[in-house]
């Protein structure tokens, strides 16, 4: 039982994380690896995950927003940090102050960065985003973009660290569109080379491309979901990469009661007991990322058996029918996401029954759920965001 304030927690298996990184490194050979740890490392805790990545061959990190980069810097993470989203002009000073590597979406943006860097007598490394078919951010693949990027490369105190793009369908069986994207990417890069535009690195490979498109590795690959032990989709060939989920969501039973047949459970009286039932209450709910969309579909692992979640999931609590799983007591451990006793109900399973993807399931787990980092079977770190506690 976890004794730190709240009987709900995530267990983050750092040995599995190290295993996953090792498998990725074996796959990519001598290519450089940038660990994508945006969204608090997909819900696993960015700072602690970053430390393990850097100890195991990851040389750079990528996040989505400036705040995430600053959090890493404030926790003494010193390696290059790329921000994948566009940082608003109002915060360009922070890019300099924290030595962050931003995305440059236009010449005017780069020009402002250049002037700021010049005024501080600093050099700033930037990443040029290309829109090869995602339709999100980045330069279009056309002659005007070649000219504009060429102008950026000539700005004082600016160094182009990478030319990067992102696949939109690499996790699908049909790779035709991804191949088309890569063709566009190479075409624009070759045009830049002809104009003597210096690009330090090229990067386009995401998790799915790492698994199935080795010709796209270029200089630097960007694994995300596969580091955390989940495949990008059901369409990728899992035989291409062996990985292990690193997170288990657990709770302790906080209340047990017997309800008579005909009793209702939860908001809206959506569940009615059709027999005399033993109901256990767990102290987590949709505010913790355990979504109401699981109504009538979720199950947990307790006493070596599955037990169904019944009634609408509340903000902070949910109820489980444990009538058929033997004696259940307050304090008993329950697995809500993960594996135990040969049974499995993980983020992929939740994604399937709620019509989403494992990424969202992992990222939804709220910051008020404490994280226990485990190595060699022992807890080596506890992170509780709510009370800003490390132990």
Swiss-Prot record:
InterPro entries found in the cross-reference section: Ala_racemase, Ala_racemase/Decarboxylase_C, Ala_racemase_C, Ala_racemase_N, Ala_racemase_pyridoxalP-BS, PLP-binding_barrel
Modified residue annotations for N6-(pyridoxal phosphate)lysine: 38
GO cellular component, one term: cytosol
Domain of life: Bacteria
Cofactor: pyridoxal 5'-phosphate
Gene3D superfamilies listed in its UniProt record: Alanine racemase, Lyase, Ornithine Decarboxylase, Chain A, domain 1
Protein name: Alanine racemase
Natural source organism: Clostridium kluyveri (strain ATCC 8527 / DSM 555 / NBRC 12016 / NCIMB 10680 / K1)
């Amino acid at each position: 039982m976890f004794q730190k304030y709240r009987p709900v927690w995530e267990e983050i298996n750092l040995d599995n994380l190290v295993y996953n990184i090792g498998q990725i490194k074996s796959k990519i050979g001598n290519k450089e690896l940038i660990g994508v740890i945006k969204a608090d490392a997909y819900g696993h805790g960015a700072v602690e995950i970053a430390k393990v990545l850097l100890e195991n061959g990851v040389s750079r990190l990528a996040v989505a927003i400036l705040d995430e980069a600053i959090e890493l810097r404030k926790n003494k993470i010193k390696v290059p940090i790329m921000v994948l989203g566009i940082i608003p002009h109002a915060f360009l000073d922070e890019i300099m102050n924290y030595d962050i590597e931003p995305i440059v979406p236009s010449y005017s943006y780069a020009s402002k960065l250049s002037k700021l860097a010049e005024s501080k007598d600093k050099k700033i490394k930037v990443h040029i985003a290309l829109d090869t078919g995602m339709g999100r951010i980045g330069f279009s693949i056309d002659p005007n973009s070649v000219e504009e990027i060429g102008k950026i490369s000539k700005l004082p105190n600016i160094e182009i660290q990478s030319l990067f793009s992102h696949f939109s369908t690499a996790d699908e069986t049909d790779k035709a569109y991804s191949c088309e994207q890569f063709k566009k990417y190479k075409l624009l890069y070759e045009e830049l080379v002809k104009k003597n535009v210096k690009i330090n690195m090229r990067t386009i490979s995401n998790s799915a491309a790492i698994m199935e498109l080795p010709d796209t590795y270029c200089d630097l690959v960007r694994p995300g979901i596969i580091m955390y032990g989940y495949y990008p989709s059901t369409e990728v060939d899992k035989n291409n990469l062996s990985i292990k989920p690193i997170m288990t969501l657990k709770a302790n039973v906080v209340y047990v009661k017997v309800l008579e047949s005909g009793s209702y459970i939860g908001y809206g009286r959506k569940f009615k007991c059709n027999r005399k039932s033993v109901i256990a209450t767990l102290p987590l709910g949709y505010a913790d990322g355990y979504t109401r969309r699981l109504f009538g579909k979720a199950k947990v692992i307790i006493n070596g058996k599955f037990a169904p979640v019944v009634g609408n999931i509340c903000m902070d609590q949910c109820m489980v029918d444990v009538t058929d799983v033997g004696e259940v007591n307050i304090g008993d451990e329950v697995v809500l996401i993960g594996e135990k006793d040969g049974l499995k109900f993980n983020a992929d399973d939740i994604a399937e029954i709620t019509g989403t993807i494992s990424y969202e399931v992992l990222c939804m787990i709220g910051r008020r759920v404490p994280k226990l980092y485990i190595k060699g079977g022992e807890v080596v770190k506890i992170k509780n965001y709510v009370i800003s506690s490390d132990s």
